[in-house]
A protein has these predicted regions:
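Catalytic alpha/beta core domains of metabolic enzymes, predominantly
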Residues: 54, 224-243
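Structural detector of well-ordered beta-strand residues that form the stable sheet scaffold
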Residues: 133, 188, 218, 239-243
Length: 243
């Protein structure tokens, strides 16, 4: 089963309510769909989200990476030669991780199709259920408390709470959420690089002193500020997660 074509297209899905983080406000999902076609007429699909503030990729750069660099490197490749095909994919262009991920998904889709089994079985998955968290958009403390309560009502037991936009409100936000959902719900905080190291230590210590029992705090400072991350980790008790 040889790769005969790789194409990209764009699609948009409007959100019912804006999704806000310290990095951006999203009103619609604008993604790139990648379709890999083989000589027996099968199609594999992958999706690439453009997240310029995080990966540096845009819709234009993703489509260019796939069509101008990855496509020529993979045409004629055998899907069955998974290691060789993946090596060609990842050496076709430096970085461009979302573009590569979408093609990776499409290739694995085809690999599973040829064998007539679900992909999760090929990858060794055996669970029929997987517990995940639900992300709460950054808003006023009252709105975030209400959104968190709705999520718990839907059965979620782990919440990821976005903060970092107007940091002076962040302690009140988490206090409101904890009061709304009670002590048994796991709370993870994601600042999306929205704090300085000093702010992060002050705010996290405030949450610790208030007994808010956080699972972790994700990316409190700029992603490239490794010294800042280390400073925060040394000066708080809550686990710090790098994104």
């Amino acid at each position: 089963m040889k790769i005969t074509d790789i194409r990209t297209s764009e699609f948009s899905v409007p959100l019912r309510t804006p999704f806000k983080t310290a990095l951006r406000t999203v009103t619609a999902i604008h993604d790139v769909l990648v379709t890999v076609t083989t000589d027996d007429g099968r199609h594999g699909y992958g999706e690439a989200p453009p997240t310029a503030p995080i990966t540096g990729e845009t819709i234009g750069s993703i489509r260019c990476a796939v069509e101008e660099f990855i496509r020529p490197a993979l045409l004629g490749r055998e899907i069955e030669d998974l290691d060789g095909t993946m090596h060609a994919l990842h050496t076709a262009i430096l970085h461009n991780t979302s573009a590569k991920a979408a093609v990776d998904m499409a290739i694995y889709d085809l690999y599973a199709q040829e064998r007539g089994v679900p992909l999760y079985r090929l990858l060794g998955g055996s669970k029929t259920e997987l517990e995940t968290d639900l992300t709460i958009s950054v808003n006023s403390p009252e709105e975030m408390a209400a959104d968190s309560l709705t999520a718990v009502g839907r059965g979620f037991r782990i919440l990821k709470i976005k903060v970092g936009l107007r940091p002076e409100l962040d302690l009140a936000r988490i206090q409101a959420v904890r009061k709304a959902v009670g002590p048994k719900i796991a709370i993870r905080v994601d600042a999306n690089q929205g704090w300085s190291p000093a702010q992060a230590v002050r705010i996290i210590r405030g949450m610790e002193d208030a007994g808010l029992a956080l699972d972790l705090v994700e990316q409190p400072v700029k992603a490239a500020d490794l010294d800042g991350m280390a400073y925060v980790r040394r000066n708080v008790s809550t686990p710090i997660l790098a994104d």
